[in-house]
């Protein structure tokens, strides 16, 4: 049960929790604004999303604005990060960069630090490298509400006019916030109730966001970790690996005679496990195990 306690901690479950039925918009769907980079999703879109968010949570409320941004390992994630930062700071927001990190970590940082107004994750999850997306997370660590999304879409379509620029000392700043990601790693480690010493754990990081975080957690808990697909190059995210190609992990676990294995998708908000025989432990069983554990404790 402890493996699931670590991998499906409150933050991962919280982010995936459905609060309401979301109606598909022109740009934003059930999991953000997603499309092929520089086709359906462009840097102009990202810049305008940043401009609106910075104004909406800042000047429009006559207050300062703080936004945290994370990204996955796609080549295009960097240009979208720069575009978002430009838009946010131009509207007066201060931006805190977690750099390459997981979607649940962004939700965790936003929810647990009182002064963040929202979080943004740049990722297209399990999609191919040429796609990308912008996920918006509110200050409760949940998906952005439909009313805010509707206002952003109206701004993208030019229906709500321009938002004012910041000037002078009102222009926002950019902060390296790797410490936030490290705090999330510490949080995951704290969920364990005992050492994993002697356990042999396989990890398929999908050449994505989990490539550094997952190993750090299991190493700290004393497990012997065996990692595959943890050398991202900007183009190999989700390519014949990760949670959408579970056979790769199944073969790896059986070949290395491991106790258990976990496969993530590109932004590590999805995880599938296999047991020592390579049998798949899917999301339904995850929920059952977590529910049973919570009931018993």
Where are these regions (language model features)?
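Short, Lys/Arg-enriched N-terminal segments with co-localized hydrophobic residues
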Residues: 1-23
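Well-ordered alpha-helical segments embedded in enzymatic catalytic cores
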Residues: 45-52, 105, 183-187, 245-248, ...
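An N-terminal, well-structured beta->alpha segment
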Residues: 15-86, 90-91, 174-199
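A short, N-terminal amphipathic alpha-helix
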Residues: 52-60, 251, 292-296
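Gly/Ser/Thr-enriched, mixed-charge loops and adjacent short helices
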Residues: 36, 132-254
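A short glycine/serine-rich beta->alpha loop
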Residues: 36-40, 93-96, 276-280
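N-terminal small/polar loop signature for handling phosphorylated ligands or for N-terminal nucleophile
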Residues: 66-131, 216-274
